[in-house]
Amino acid sequence: MGRHFDIGYFKKTLKVRSKVAKERTVVNKMYAWQLGKEYYDGSRLNGYGGFRYDGRWLKLLPKIIKRYKLTKNSKVLDLGCKKGFLLKDLNILIPGIKSYGIENHDYALKNAVKSKSKLIKCEYTKLPFKNKSLDFVIAFNSLYMQNLGDVIKSLKEIERVSKKSYIVLASGEN
């Protein structure tokens, strides 16, 4: 833990998000905090703005797969999986991999893409996995909406379920 690993997240996306953030009103932010239809599939000012599968993780996942030596025998968790796009691409790149997604909001799960991954609704602070049962856990832009106490609990849970404590935490805001 503690080493920097740049997966090369989409630079153009970060520029667009920065511009949109300046235009958001209080009402837009209220929609965003609900993490429902308006956030995922409404206006860009409310959140993702038409959050649809586009295969973007197919370009980034090979770096992660190589770095963490993921194979079809690996067990992977995407914590805060949203609509499951990363997991869908992971299953395309490594057929047969055991992959799980945890999301704590109904709308994203009900509108998730079809994939071989098992998607579970639960809080990030109480993961339904045995100790040291997962080869890799990614928490990408998922913990930032929690209070500090829950962030700490979530990080402890990630460490508890990870065999090697491989964690990728990222935010495109700063």
Give residue spans per PLM region:
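Conserved class I S-adenosyl-L-methionine
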Residues: 73-82, 166-174
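Class I SAM-dependent methyltransferase SAM/SAH-binding core
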Residues: 83-126
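N-terminal auxiliary segments of SAM/dcSAM-dependent transferases
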Residues: 1-30
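Conserved alpha-helix/loop element of class I SAM-dependent methyltransferases that forms part
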Residues: 54-71
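A conserved beta-strand element that flanks and buttresses the S-adenosyl-L-methionine
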Residues: 138
